[in-house]
Curated annotation (Swiss-Prot):
Signal peptide: none annotated. GO terms for cellular component: cytoplasm. This is Imidazole glycerol phosphate synthase subunit hisF1. Transmembrane segments: none annotated. It comes from the Bacteria. The keyword Cytoplasm applies. Pathway: Amino-acid biosynthesis; L-histidine biosynthesis; L-histidine from 5-phospho-alpha-D-ribose 1-diphosphate: step 5/9. It catalyses: 5-[(5-phospho-1-deoxy-D-ribulos-1-ylimino)methylamino]-1-(5-phospho-beta-D-ribosyl)imidazole-4-carboxamide + L-glutamine = D-erythro-1-(imidazol-4-yl)glycerol 3-phosphate + 5-amino-1-(5-phospho-beta-D-ribosyl)imidazole-4-carboxamide + L-glutamate + H(+). InterPro entries: Aldolase_TIM (IPR013785), His_biosynth (IPR006062), HisF (IPR004651), IGPS_HisA/HisF (IPR050064), RibuloseP-bd_barrel (IPR011060). HAMAP family: HisF (MF_01013). GO terms for biological process: L-histidine biosynthetic process. It comes from Campylobacter jejuni subsp. jejuni serotype O:2 (strain ATCC 700819 / NCTC 11168). It is found in: Cytoplasm.
Length: 255
């Protein structure tokens, strides 16, 4: 059994870590480096940093904080936001990031996934998918979700896009379930299972974790990692206690 990963997500905006609910009303959560160091020292397996405004504002991620994070932690981390070219990715990887994740730029230029995979290896290339479930249960891919003024339906369905990004060379998929984001009432297991069934690469669940049981429910579907933000930032769940709980439930977890 592959070891399951517990991942903390740090949404970055204007040089600070923020957190919203359903991708809206972002509140300040603290300093990037301090939080990165805290998570590294408290048992998290991996960190994902999303510069949530970079793509919407057509900005680049600040290389300075990426480099500082790399100097201050000893765990794997992934960076996302505004990565539109091989040059952008190369700079972030050179500054210490282990992986890069693309979301809106991949929707605008799907060949970017293939180019990045060829340049840096599929293990470095994560595709983030912001998936919204409408009132009829249809799963739709949204883009530019870091700013509610720019957030819009991309015209693509989630399941079709999941298949497509794998064909193009994605090494991992993070499924951001927008309806669940920050609500803490559990991952959307129905959506997660539908995506998992067509996923041949590692799948990470994002959006909805509120208690330890929610992580267990998601992992029981077979996914590789579970990502959360609110419950970790607000210290509602202790990471080490969560890992012990999951290990006691029979999962392969790094303690």
């Amino acid at each position: 059994m592959l070891t399951k990963r517990i991942i903390a997500c740090l949404d970055v905006k204007d040089g600070r870590v923020v957190k919203g609910t359903q991708f809206k009303n972002h509140k300040d959560m603290g300093d990037i480096i301090e939080l990165a160091r805290y998570y590294s020292q408290n048992g998290i397996d991996e960190l994902v940093f999303y510069d949530i405004a970079a793509s919407a504002r057509k900005e680049r991620i600040s290389r300075e904080w990426v480099s500082e994070v790399a100097k201050n932690i000893n765990i794997s981390f992934c960076v996302a936001g505004g990565i539109k070219s091989e040059e952008d990715a190369a700079e972030l990887l050179a500054n210490g990031a282990d992986k890069i994740s693309i979301n809106s730029p991949a929707l605008n230029d799907p060949s970017l996934i293939t180019r990045l995979a060829k340049s840096f290896g599929v293990q470095c290339v994560v595709v983030g998918i912001d998936s919204f479930k409408d009132e009829n249960g249809n799963l739709k891919v949204f883009q530019y979700t870091g700013d509610e003024k720019t957030s819009k339906h991309s015209g693509k369905s989630t399941l079709e896009w999941v298949k497509k990004v794998q064909d193009l060379g994605a090494g991992e998929i993070v499924l951001n379930m927008m309806n669940q984001d920050g609500v803490k009432n559990g991952y959307d297991l129905e959506q997660l299972e539908a995506v998992y069934k067509i996923c041949k690469v590692p799948l990470i669940a994002s959006g909805g974790a509120g208690k330890m049981e929610h992580f267990l429910e998601a992992f029981k579907l077979g996914i590789d990692g579970a990502l959360a933000a609110s419950v970790f930032h607000q210290k509602l769940i202790d990471i080490k206690e969560l890992k012990i709980y999951l290990k006691n439930q029979g999962l392969s977890i790094r303690i």
